């Protein structure tokens, strides 16, 4: 039967293993039995589980006194580590003392092992190791971070990032990553799926650039423009420029083709969307917009519509809409562009056209044009032309209405002199028995949103389409 407690030395009743002891204490606990085997004596020994607070203090003080060597206490508290530089100032004599002292302690430990045949206890070995570590200056590396050698992948990444930064800094400061630049040199698209044939003449490109720079003044379109995401803005600018180039030169292909093949009822129904048709129908009088589609078909087939198309081709062929001529004024060109879409009997288009042709022939002459009407019932309008040498009154029998204008001053350059002339072809308010046509030209700028306020019946849609092109 195994041994049973309690321990004859400390009085513990439970232990993992009961051990043999000296004859006066035959049964010992695990701790006391281990002490007896290693040291051979139980004098002044109390295991940790049996110590009281007072006994622990006494044993600790006693152990401190036994470790005193040459008046030097080894149980000092571990001092705070001083800066790294102070570790190099330790005197050589102190270093030799600690080295000899440690060697002596190791010799004593070896003798104890040989005499008792076992190792020293855990508590004493820990106390001794702490004592040596606390007094002997240990050499540690500094905490200064050393640069780590970069790998080849990191070097390549850094070089690429540097190149990217240089490229971004070299770019213009006003541009963004989402802006794209397009140069529109040869626009071919006229709109609604139709493609315009180009002029084969060699000088066509120069004429196009001059005409487009002046006719499209309201939209301020240029050959190089910024477009975000290549959206609808670029397409609209191309269409505007193409239309202005078609009208802005006397050699335009509009003069040689049959416009009735382009402006007809079938093309209107086939090529225009429902939204575009509704937008153009707002420009028509109520007579043409109520009974659809018969009213539209009769409008396209009317003789008045065909007459307007032929007159428009004649004006384009004569170069009326070219703004690079020296005798023409920009406001007059814009006015003619609008009048070409109205009834020639109402809009005084012929008078304005003849007036421009006269300026081309006459040089060094100051001309003041005034067109007025005596009353709405009169069928004739009076045009007065004053010259330095003579005065001439000319009556036009085919014009009716009232035409008024504020005085505007324009400089005409001739071969020898530059003189001022007053022009009065900027505001028209014609009235006739054919319909209340009220057309007021107040702004000098023509935009694509200009609407034809009143047009004759059975001849409105193509006129509105031509107005949109201008």
Curated annotation (Swiss-Prot):
Protein name: GATA transcription factor 27
Keyword Transmembrane assigned: no
Family according to the record: Belongs to the type IV zinc-finger family. Class D subfamily.
Subcellular location: Nucleus
InterPro entries reported for this sequence: ASX_DEUBAD_dom (IPR028020), DEUBAD_dom (IPR044867), GATA26/27 (IPR044589), Znf_GATA (IPR000679), Znf_NHR/GATA (IPR013088)
Domain DEUBAD: 250-359
Major localization listed first in the record, in broad terms: nucleus
Role summary: Transcriptional regulator that specifically binds 5'-GATA-3' or 5'-GAT-3' motifs within gene promoters.
ZnF GATA-type: positions: 1-55
Alphabetic keyword roster: DNA-binding, Metal-binding, Nucleus, Transcription, Transcription regulation, Zinc, Zinc-finger
Gene Ontology molecular functions: DNA-binding transcription factor activity; sequence-specific DNA binding; zinc ion binding
Gene3D superfamilies: Erythroid Transcription Factor GATA-1, subunit A
Underlying gene: GATA27
GO cellular component, one term: nucleus
Lineage: Eukaryota, Viridiplantae, Streptophyta, Embryophyta, Tracheophyta
UniProt keyword DNA repair, yes or no: no
Lineage top rank: taxon: Eukaryota
